[in-house]
Amino acid sequence: MAEVRAKLAPGIPIDVWCQDEMRVGQKNKLTYRWARKGSRPLAVHDQRTQSTYLFGAVCPELGTGAALVLPACNSEAMQLHLDEIATKVSPGAHAILLLDQAGWHGAKILKVPSNITLMPLPPRTPELNGQENIWQFMRQNWLSNRIFKSFDDIVDHCCYAWNTLIDQPWKIMSIARRDWTTMGHSM
């Protein structure tokens, strides 16, 4: 983060964002449920395969985020998401975007907006990315153990889940915050 700070004009605030994407579809994952001890709770499970991708990013310090529901997970979709994130960065601030090393995150065709710097996380370290915990929370609360009727139903549920989360900034702050990500504000 110090390298990014050195390249910016003095006094420009840095917002640290976490980015990731998840597949949501008819053949969805099962999650834990509350049930009486000794019982075996039932959960529906669909064998159809329609799905979509939810690209999401949050700024845990500010409790805000940016997301898109897209039909594919590739560099074109990543470009759309970067452009969306750029519109949500605080005015006059610069964003450091933490992300994993998926191929489309570092594609040469990406045109990274001027108010964003990409910062790849080390390989196989999902615990460093607060967005992973956001996905877990969304699955447990809104997106799992259900049958989606159609592709549009999947998209509607993704939008509902994200919009419900965004309306609760304290949840984003609580779930995705890492102590070391606040360094950008104090430098």
Name these PLM-found stretches.
Residues 92-105, 129:
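Acidic/histidine-rich, metal-coordinating catalytic segments
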Residues 17-19, 95-99, 119-122, 174:
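Short beta-strand segments
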Residues 12-16, 131-187:
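C-terminal anion-handling pockets and recognition modules
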Residues 39-48, 114-133, 147:
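RNase H-like polynucleotidyl transferase catalytic core
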Residues 20, 56-57, 63, 82, ...:
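Mobile genetic element proteins and their domesticated derivatives, centered on retroelements
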Residues 77-96:
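Short, basic/hydrophobic alpha-helical segments
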Residues 107-115:
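Short, aromatic/basic amphipathic alpha-helical patches
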Residues 1-83, 177-187:
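Extended, low-complexity cationic-aromatic segments
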